[in-house]
Amino acid sequence: MNNNLPIGSIAAAVDLLNKENVIAYPTEAVFGVGCDPDSETAVTRLLALKQRPVDKGLILIAASFEQLKPYIDDSILTAAQRKAVFDCWPGPVTFVFPAPATTPRWLTGRFDSLAVRVTNHPLVVALCNAYGKPLVSTSANLSGLPPCRTVEEVRAQFGDDFPVVEGATGGRLNPSEIRDALTGELFRQG
């Protein structure tokens, strides 16, 4: 079965996400692989694919801040901290927020926080809007290999049958910057 999704096949991607599958899609800099953040089965599949330990935690990517609110606690942010976050969104900056106790450990790992981003990539915005929630999102690459920047690279690393939403990345050279929403501390340079 060929699961490659032609560009614009958002409905097919949503169907695969609803079936707890992991899919690949273009983001601002590289292709990402993602899944339903509320499905432990889907997240376990993603972690196995990436050979990533669950304790490292994951990133959620969303079309809007509203989609992220069930997973984070922004109540302790000051007006200045909130402004610093919203000045960067939508865009390629990921912020680490406190996470409420209801956020699943398969997302937060060993942390009491969660990394989240509101994307400005039009295809991912459309995908998250059609799905109605954020996606777990991590770079599309197998352990020890560079992140994929094209559909062809995704197919080379993950196989011809891996479901790929075809499209172009946003042209950025580096993955998203990661900052603490409370302190502004830089965890990863973008």
From Swiss-Prot:
It comes from the Bacteria. The keyword Nucleotidyltransferase applies. The keyword Nucleotidyltransferase applies. GO terms for cellular component: cytoplasm. InterPro entries: DHBP_synth_RibB-like_a/b_dom, Sua5-like_dom, TC-AMP_synthase, TC-AMP_synthase_SUA5. Its EC number is 2.7.7.87. One of its GO terms (molecular function) is ATP binding. SUPFAM superfamilies: YrdC/RibB. Keywords: ATP-binding, Cytoplasm, Nucleotide-binding, Nucleotidyltransferase, Transferase, tRNA processing. This is Threonylcarbamoyl-AMP synthase.
